[in-house]
């Protein structure tokens, strides 16, 4: 099924707008001006609808390409704050020791249940041989409880060691900062649904920018753009 059927604008224009919005810290109105300079007259509200429709689809179609690396680098997990409808929500994130994105999960709560769902999501998306020996988190007890439950359920190998070494999480703290600079242009989100849809696009573009799918670019400087276009042809 063609996801662009019935759209007034061409697929490449829509994907260009979604990709740039999710990649750079620009607003919908700024992107509207950029498109107008290129002869594309589209309202910022239309660009918003494009992002809500196609950013999650882009993350879904590209996940196989930027999926969790298989070199067993330790995972580092932490959460950061995102403003949603005037309140703080919690974006759970994991990167490996080389800074590559492992996964993410947006929650309205910061507790053991949210940590369990986040860790469960990661484990559902990887093979058991891709799970590292060490997982590092902060001192929050929620991660320890979640890991213990997942081990009892047989979803997490029993020999995975949970570490809580603060300085080792500098890698994800740094990655939070880069992500927040992009999210900062949004001035908050109206709902959890719109926030998560947008964040999915931002996270996948961050993963591509880190080079996590560069093996499919074949040294092409425009490889990222072509890869995004290619997955929507399938």
Per-region residue spans from a language model:
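Short, basic alpha-helical nucleic acid-contact segments in DNA-binding proteins
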Residues: 49-70, 153-154
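Mobile genetic element proteins and their domesticated derivatives, centered on retroelements
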Residues: 17, 31, 47, 77-78, ...
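Short conserved beta-strand segments at catalytic cores or DNA/RNA-binding microdomains
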Residues: 85-101, 111, 119-123
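Active-site beta-loop-alpha junctions of metal-dependent nucleic acid enzymes
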Residues: 53, 104-128
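Helix-centered, glycine/charged polyanion-binding patches within enzymatic domains
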Residues: 139-203, 207
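DNA-recognition alpha helix
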Residues: 27-40
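C-terminal domain-tail junction helix/linker
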Residues: 197-234
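Basic, short loop/linker segments at the boundary and entry of helix-turn-helix/winged-helix-like folds
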Residues: 1-23, 39-43, 48, 66, ...
